[in-house]
Amino acid sequence: MNAVQIDQLKQQFPLIETLQAYQETFWFNPHRYPLNEALAKVCLTEQDVKEAEARLARFAPYLAKVFPETQAQHGKIESALVEIAEMQQALSLQKHKTLTGKLWLKKDSHLPISGSIKARGGIYEVLAHAEKLAIEAGLLKLEDDYSKLDQDSFRTFFSKYQIAVGSTGNLGLSIGIMSAKLGFRVSVHMSADARQWKKDKLRSLGVNVVEYASDYGVAVEEGRKAAEQDPFCFFIDDENSTTLFLGYAVAGLRLKQQFEQKQIKVDADHPLFVYLPCGVGGGPGGVSFGLKLAFGEHVHCIFAEPTHSPCMLLGVYTGLHDQISVNDIGLDNITAADGLAVGRASGFVGRAMQQLIDGYYTIHDECLYELIALLNQTENIQVEPSAAAGMMGPYYVQTTPDYLALHQLSAEKLQHATHVVWATGGGMVPPDEMQKYLTYSQRN
């Protein structure tokens, strides 16, 4: 986009100036549709999500066999939901605003196998591809015990095929670990933002890591081009994959089960707010789709992005989606939240979910560091900077009168609200790297 086009855009969408100044902001979505209308625009259904859940159940015996850390949950890749009352109290003191309701942390940061939310979508898509190949070759039937996949004959079969992906880090880690375990050849195309330890981990598993000096968008595009040259290569497209999206969506059904176990009520008088860090959009978009299916109108899904990389907010706010990048408005797309360092949002997710997502806000890197230090201090939970982005959500909701009025959220309803911050990564961060994060946060 040229300067004239951007100036015209700013006249129509004044919030762009706030984004250009790297200021923190909250924008609630005035274009929310009634739930059934909005869900229909996604072009995926609850049945699709249930089929994804069934596929994960078929693979559970195999996962339990090859990843001992999943045995306690019988091969289910799921994270804990924990109340963080001390963190809530600390945030209230920090913001001089009593945050009402109950604050919970969804610890996808500590998901088994790869320690991030990407263990949902990334691993699911690899499993779906492996199942398809094995069934087509007559090696597997749906009714089989999938633990049979842990044999040299299957690893030899899968080694004929390659899987490729472009990533800022965590998606590549999830796909690389799972693909290598099955026997696939794997190439992960990584952007300049990717942490060195993630590259080292992948290489230790025999994964081909291709590094780029550019950002996420270039890594994805180059990965896609390379995959097109090899008929035996399957490219996992983080920007457009409905399979990835469905892998994430299963989380909505799972959270509902956890709520039932903990007897957490969600209805018109007991609203649920879920705050999700957003990069390209597949993870939070898929999870939000699952949440809307599970909890209906009573769940509010709010995305959090770095002030340097607000690609989804920019795309949805202007209606341009993947036709505009943060670079077009002069932002540098450089952030400590490496998992969120994405300049151009997924057009598929933006268009599919634009009538379902309730709000978007941006957050400074300095604030992310403060939040990971506070979470460590109050709850002894360690996450990476991007995973803390959702922590400011309750404050924005409760201090935005227009949002509360739009959704008829009275003070009494907020007293009975449940707030879930979705922690997206950090479980596999080496201890010395985590200490660097915490030391840096104490200096600032």
Swiss-Prot record:
Keywords of the record, alphabetical order, are: Lyase, Pyridoxal phosphate
Q: List the disulfide bonds.
A: none
Q: Which cofactor does it need?
A: pyridoxal 5'-phosphate
Q: Which PROSITE patterns match?
A: DEHYDRATASE_SER_THR (PS00165)
- Which domain of life does the UniProt lineage start with? Bacteria
One GO BP: isoleucine biosynthetic process
Q: Which Pfam families match?
A: PALP
GO MF term set: D-serine ammonia-lyase activity; hydro-lyase activity; pyridoxal phosphate binding
Reactions it catalyzes: D-serine = pyruvate + NH4(+)
EC no. given is 4.3.1.18
Q: Does the keyword Lyase apply?
A: yes
N6-(pyridoxal phosphate)lysine-modified residues are 118
Q: Which family does it belong to?
A: Belongs to the serine/threonine dehydratase family. DsdA subfamily.
Protein name per its UniProtKB record = Probable D-serine dehydratase
User: What is the native source organism of this protein?
Assistant: Acinetobacter baumannii (strain ACICU)
Q: What is the lineage of its organism?
A: Bacteria, Pseudomonadati, Pseudomonadota, Gammaproteobacteria, Moraxellales
